[in-house]
UniProtKB/Swiss-Prot annotation:
This is DNA gyrase subunit B. Heterotetramer, composed of two GyrA and two GyrB chains. Within the heterotetramer, GyrA contains the active site tyrosine that forms a covalent intermediate with the DNA, while GyrB contributes the cofactor binding sites and catalyzes ATP hydrolysis. The lineage of its organism: Bacteria, Bacillati, Bacillota, Bacilli, Lactobacillales. GO terms for molecular function: ATP binding; DNA binding; DNA negative supercoiling activity; metal ion binding. GO terms for biological process: DNA topological change; DNA-templated DNA replication. It comes from Enterococcus faecalis (strain ATCC 700802 / V583).
Length: 642
């Protein structure tokens, strides 16, 4: 925990502006009024408790989803100040909950470091809740105040004596604001709670669900902090050295923590945080780390004669292959920029991170020559594969990005050139591809048949991936490029539809394609361009009429219902479609491709870390985690093709 700031009292609560606009324009303060915004309310309150932990005063935090989907957050910090705040003439706790930008975060007195720009937190949550109440446990007393839609109900009062210290906040999100949903997602909250436990070494933090039929509780506490985080991220991977490297230092009031470990895989996974906020877009702390890592490894390799004089320098891409790293900084005044305000902009952080990491990592390599040699050798192998991939890439470029005659996948393109209207169906097998070509709308639907199972990219290096014809044809058809040349704005289709058979092989091909998109074309997944077609599982024919039943866990019940509702004569016949090839072009269009009638599932990434681990477990080299997953989930299997 950081060095404690001085006393925390009413004089440290500063007021910047009023609260009127929050209910009129909630999106300006919490991003949206969808499920994302609803969950954001929780973090605004939790961040206040985390600030107490960062300052060294709180040791435990509890987050509770109450039976009515309201939220309670409990901490054992100092308790929000209850004295009179000079500017407002009201108790400090009331000021915190009723005045926008009031808090102990702006003057640097209450907190040396706080959770990003969350000074707006408490008052915004109050404004967007039908009711909120706060209990402050301080100086032997329990202080209580209640609010309705941001307005004070009663003056702050003492309701009992106590030997506890801390703050408890309970709020009910306002359904007038959150019109889409007021139902909390336990797993979503638990993921972030666990992340906060990793980022704040030694903190005890729990999440509990008290809703009927959903009761659950998870408690997190990691003495290893981000070192434990790296171990968690690499749980299903084969690592090159057993224990993650951990580096910590402080300069100019900026604390830098880095933990890293290499795996035998081909993908890097670098997560960066500033004041506990996940900086998805990176920033100066991440670039400082990357620059330093590349320079230190190259210097070490030359000094130890692990590379020859005329060997080409290892690039950043080379030294990051197979790397899992977490970079976490704490800064008194973080500046966030970028599209989603998740990119750290402070220029001094780059220098501090570079300097601190360089010093500690150089020392580590000198003291651990075996590990140092393993890291350099991995980088050199990556360099060879990169140069081979570069040659393959140049060959592909010379053929021209859109010369369809060069596509081994036999792309049947559409006539429209408007990417927003265009759809690319990736179809399993030539026979289904033929039906799809016949049945499609040629104006906006393109068909790319793929033969057999494509390469599992989770286990392959870039040069092997680019040598695979099916994958090359897909990259070329999309027009986005790949790897370092990838550009989502060049996508020729804004709907990429995976259309496979409803059997085990079809599911496998679908997973292989999703692995490819996630690992090498992730921006198209994040942009919402990837879909999975939902061809029917059954066709019930009676006379000239056909009723289709979609796949899903209730498919059998749906089929029984359809049969029950049909007249007994003429006798209906049931066909189970195992393959797309069993449908003619008219049926395929009607059931799976017609925008007016079809069902499609859009692929999204809600939790990138979990997605990363699932792909590694299902598609990676290690058998044990996969076997454990199968044993754990086998009882869910309903239809098994043997």
């Amino acid at each position: 925990m950081r060095e404690r700031a001085q006393e925390y009292d009413a004089s440290q609560i500063q007021v910047l502006e009023g609260l009127e606009a929050v209910r009129k324009r909630p999106g300006m303060y919490i991003g949206s009024t969808s499920g994302e915004g609803l969950h954001h309310l929780v973090w605004e309150i939790v961040d206040n408790s985390i600030d107490e932990a960062l300052a060294g005063f709180a040791k435990s935090i509890q987050v509770i989803i109450e039976p009515d989907d309201s939220i309670t957050v409990i901490d054992d910090g100092r308790g929000i100040p209850v004295g009179i705040q000079a500017k407002t003439g009201r108790p400090a706790v009331e000021t915190v909950f009723t005045v926008l930008h009031a808090g102990g975060k702006f003057g640097g007195g209450g907190y040396k470091v706080s959770g990003g720009l969350h000074g707006v937190g408490s008052s915004v949550v109050n404004a967007l809740s039908t009711s909120l109440d706060v209990r402050v446990y301080k100086d032997g007393k329990v202080y209580y105040q209640e609010y309705r839609r941001g307005a004070v109900v009663d003056d702050l009062k003492v309701i009992e004596e106590t030997d506890r210290h801390g703050t408890t906040v309970h709020f009910i999100p306002d359904p007038e604001i959150f019109t889409e949903t007021t139902v909390y997602d336990f797993d979503k909250l638990a993921t972030r709670v666990r992340e906060l436990a990793f980022l704040n070494r030694g903190l005890h933090i729990s999440i509990e669900d008290r809703r009927e039929g959903q009761e659950d509780k998870k408690e997190y506490h990691y003495e290893g902090g981000i070192k434990s985080y790296v171990e968690h991220l690499n749980a299903n991977k084969d690592v090159i050295f057993p224990e993650p490297i951990f580096i910590e230092g402080e300069q100019q009031d900026i604390t830098v923590e880095v933990s890293m470990q290499y795996t035998d895989g081909y993908h890097s996974n670098i997560l960066s945080f500033a004041n506990n906020i996940h900086t998805y877009e990176g920033g100066t702390h991440e670039s400082g780390f990357k620059t330093s890592l590349t320079r230190v490894i190259n210097d070490y390799a030359r000094k130890q004669k692990l590379m020859k004089e005329n060997d080409e320098k290892l690039t950043g891409e080379d030294v990051r292959e197979g790397l899992t790293a977490v970079v976490s900084i704490k800064h008194p005044d973080p500046q966030f920029e970028g599209q989603t305000k998740t990119k750290l902009g402070n220029s001094e952080v780059r220098t501090v991170t570079d300097r601190l990491f360089s010093e500690y990592f150089t020392k580590f390599l000198m003291e651990n020559p075996t590990v140092g040699k393993q890291i350099v050798e991995k980088g050199m192998l990556a360099s060879k594969a990169r140069l081979a991939a570069k040659r393959a890439r140049e060959v592909t470029r010379r053929k021209g990005a859109l010369e369809i005659s060069n596509l081994p996948g036999k792309l049947a393109d559409c006539s429209s050139k408007d990417p927003e209207k265009c759809e690319l169906f990736i179809v399993e097998g030539d026979s289904a591809g033929g039906s799809a070509k016949q049945g499609r709308s040629r104006e906006f639907q393109a068909i790319l048949p793929i033969r057999g199972k494509i390469l599992n990219v989770e286990k392959a290096s870039m040069d092997k991936i680019l040598a695979n014809e099916e994958i090359r044809s897909l990259f070329t058809a999309m027009g986005t490029g790949f790897g370092e040349d990838f550009d989502v704005s060049k996508a020729r289709y804004h709907k990429l539809v995976i259309m496979t058979d409803a059997d085990v092989d079809g599911a496998h091909i679908r997973t292989l394609l999703l692995t490819l998109f996630y690992r090498f074309m992730r921006p198209i997944v994040e942009a919402g361009y990837v879909y999975i077609a939902q061809p029917p599982l059954y066709g019930v024919k009676q006379g000239k009429n056909i009723t289709y039943v979609q796949p899903g866990k209730h498919a059998e019940e749906e089929l029984a219902k359809v049969l029950e509702e049909l007249p007994a004569s003429p006798k209906p016949s049931v066909q189970r479609y195992k393959g797309l090839g069993e449908m003619d072009d008219h049926q395929l269009w009607e059931t799976t491709m017609d925008p007016e009638k079809r069902l499609m599932a859009r692929v999204s990434v809600d939790d990138a870390i979990e997605a990363d681990q699932i792909f590694e477990m299902l598609m990676g080299d290690r058998v044990e985690p996969r076997r454990a997953f199968i044993e754990e989930n086998a009882h869910y299997v309903k239809n098994l093709d043997i």
